[in-house]
Curated annotation (Swiss-Prot):
Residues of the active site: D72, D141, H143, E148
Origin species: Porphyromonas gingivalis (strain ATCC 33277 / DSM 20709 / CIP 103683 / JCM 12257 / NCTC 11834 / 2561)
Pathway(s) it belongs to: Amino-sugar metabolism; N-acetylneuraminate degradation; D-fructose 6-phosphate from N-acetylneuraminate: step 5/5
Reactions accelerated catalytically: alpha-D-glucosamine 6-phosphate + H2O = beta-D-fructose 6-phosphate + NH4(+)
Superkingdom, natural source: Bacteria
Gene (name only): nagB
UniProt GO MF annotations: glucosamine-6-phosphate deaminase activity; identical protein binding
InterPro entries associated with the record: Glc/Gal-6P_isomerase, Glucosamine6P_isomerase, Glucosamine6P_isomerase_CS, NagB/RpiA_transferase-like
SS bonds (residue pairs): none
Pfam families: Glucosamine_iso
Protein family membership: Belongs to the glucosamine/galactosamine-6-phosphate isomerase family. NagB subfamily.
Protein name (database record): Glucosamine-6-phosphate deaminase
Length: 263
């Protein structure tokens, strides 16, 4: 596992966007062999998306041969609702880059058969050749996607009931009214994420400090699903200084030292 520690959120976002661009360029995707990208929502990736949009508009990167799969979507929230993840992704990324509409994949939380929708999503990922780079964020309780504490570390795409903590955290997007927040979601599983050839997680702010500590220094546990990343063959956590306040001094200094030429 790599840990990239940047001074602040803006620097974190720029580093993450530059890494995505680098990986796409290195893959040199074509229509026959596209680059497959897993994408998150929430507040953490917004800065990265802003930088990717800027790079695309400046001609530094093209998404024409990129296929995307989003991590999750609320159940029962209309696609056109401003807080649906469909709306979020189009607002922050898809409407501003040259990605082909048919290459965008987001779970349908209003599907008549939600289990069938989840199974079809897994098959679509497999048919695309698997995910080259899965990007994600984490919650204060260490959940990745909507894999709440207690989720199986081998889980696949499925329906999940959200914890009270997650509902409270997400209520900031719903006028701080928990009654408006959907209580269920469709989400890729921990196993789905771990199948990606590479995983990059964005962690910012002091509210994520304990989760980062568990991710880097804690034992692998289903109670902190982010800890599964320790077992991944190629994983990166990109964080800011505020998220590092609970790391041991030795841990912090170690990663600052070995990554000093990559910041």
């Amino acid at each position: 596992m790599r840990l990239i520690i940047e001074p602040d959120y803006d620097k974190l976002s720029t580093w993450a966007a530059d890494y995505v661009i680098e990986r796409i360029h290195k893959a040199a995707p074509t229509a026959e062999k596209p680059f497959v990208l897993g994408l998150p929502t929430g507040s953490s990736p917004i800065g990265m998306y802003r930088e990717l949009v800027k790079a695309c508009k400046e001609g530094c990167i093209s998404f024409r041969h990129v296929i995307t799969f989003n991590m999750d979507e609320y159940v029962g929230l209309a696609t056109e609702h401003p807080e649906s993840y469909h709306s979020f992704m189009h607002r922050h990324l898809f409407d501003h880059i040259d990605i082909l509409p048919q290459n965008i994949h987001i779970l349908n939380g209003n599907a008549p058969d939600l289990t069938a929708e989840c199974d079809a999503y897994e098959r679509a990922i497999e048919a695309a050749g698997g995910i080259d780079l899965f990007i994600g964020g984490i919650g204060p309780d260490g959940h990745i996607a909507f894999n709440e504490p207690g989720s199986s570390l081998t889980s696949r795409t499925r329906i999940k009931t959200l914890t009270t903590d997650t509902v409270l955290a997400n209520s900031r997007f719903f006028d701080n009214d928990t009654n408006q927040v959907p209580k269920r979601a469709l989400t890729v599983g921990v196993g789905t994420i771990m199948d990606a050839r590479e995983v990059m997680i964005l962690v910012n702010g002091h509210t994520k400090a304990r989760a980062l500590r568990e991710a880097v220094e804690g034992a692998v546990s289903q109670m902190w699903t982010i800890t599964a990343l320790q077992l991944h063959r190629q994983s990166i956590i990109v964080c800011d200084e505020a998220a590092c306040v609970e790391l041991k001094v030795g841990t912090y200094n170690y990663f600052k030292d070995i990554e000093r030429n990559n910041l």
